[in-house]
Amino acid sequence: MWEQPSIIAVRMKKPNTSPQASLKATVKTGATAASRAVSGFSYSRPFFEDLVDTALKHAKKLGATDAAAEASEGCGLSVSVRKGELENVERNRDKSLGVTVYLGKRRGNASTSDFSRAAIEQTVQAAYDIARFTAEDPFAALPDAADIAVPAEQRTDLDLFYPWAITSEQAAELAMACEAAALQTSKRITNSEGAGVSAQQSHFFSAHTSGFRGGYASSRHSMSVSPIASSPGKGQDMQRDAWYSSMRNAEELASPQAIGRYAAERALSRLKSRKIATTECAVLFESPLAAGLLGSFVQAISGGALYRKSSFLMDSMGKQVLPKHIDIAEDPFIKRGKGSSPFDEEGVKVQARQVVEAGRVQGYFLSSYSARKLGMKTTGNAGGSHNLILSSRLTKAGDNLDAMLQRLGTGLFVTELMGSGVNYVTGDYSRGASGFWVEKGRIAFPVEEITIAGNMKDMLKGILAVGSDTYNYGAKTVGSILVNRMKVAGS
């Protein structure tokens, strides 16, 4: 039996995000209500409202049946370092006005980054001309008035905007601290692919002639590092891994020291990886990878795949597609949530709902267009899903990673996947993978250069357990997932 280095025992403990270990102890964002009024944007909300109204009025003047317009602006700072030296500083700022014009059941789209009056009129004219020569689509239309989100004064503030007034020098200092923490974890951390800090923010305003008006500002900040571990001696082994933290509010980011150490622990744990013989066994997906399984499920029950009849979950409404202990909830109203929004991209009202209850599909993910194509009602998912939480009714508070490894017994614990490898028409699943071979509930040795394969229908129905080691990956929250059986192709 391969002897685990002591660092393996703590490798899967995610960085502490308590105030003591958070970025709040390192740098202040200054994200008070007063400071948020000074956003760093070049354009104000009233300016965007006037821009959009001008576009809509011109569309109606040209003879449009209906029209929609959206003005947006994004800006930010990205800094990367490597081996203690500044590598790249990038400031980005972009703006756009998008216009959609309807002529009956014909639709045209155009956009511009020029906010002058002449450019606005030219853009509307371009959208109008495209609509004139586009074939009719019986399902093309703005959302029904009954589905429009409530007026702005009735919407809940979801606390999505925390501008980070950080300089490039401060960002570089944080990135260097993150990389240094990784390099100082062990003498076997011998190199680095670099560390980075990003501060991004955006705002928009949209409206259409069915009565919707709305917009908001949001932010997304992150810090990451990718260290390289190596083992000395004959047949030198080198392994890379990475970790990151991403939040709306920079003060809630994990500290650079926690991110760096954890990334280093992950890289170290992969040293002396081996190949394994081809087999069939149970597979435990690490929680960040489990979010990918949830994403594949969402895509399969989304409107575009369903009306094109290109989904392995066609006609699944009300059917048992997951075990009875599995629930999936969607909640657009989580404060500071990465998938939170008071309305979808069409201005349609959103709702908290059960997408899956006791393993049965209770709802799809539909825009107004895909809903019409399917003869259903929109679910407020133009632009995709909102915050999703996958849970098991069997999960207990103590079902952490150690408990899930015990539940796995002997099998494969997957911590990295390569390639896309999902056929959404058939459900066939095949991806390159690496991770750890587990025997009797304990990690035996790291493995690499393997392929795991199965069918998504069988994988979903074969979920035995979901861990309490929940991880928020983007807009998806899920613990590690144990699947009963998959093919593992090795040497």
Predicted regions and their residues:
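Residues forming anionic-ligand binding surfaces in small-molecule and nucleic-acid pockets
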Residues: 104, 147-163, 230-250
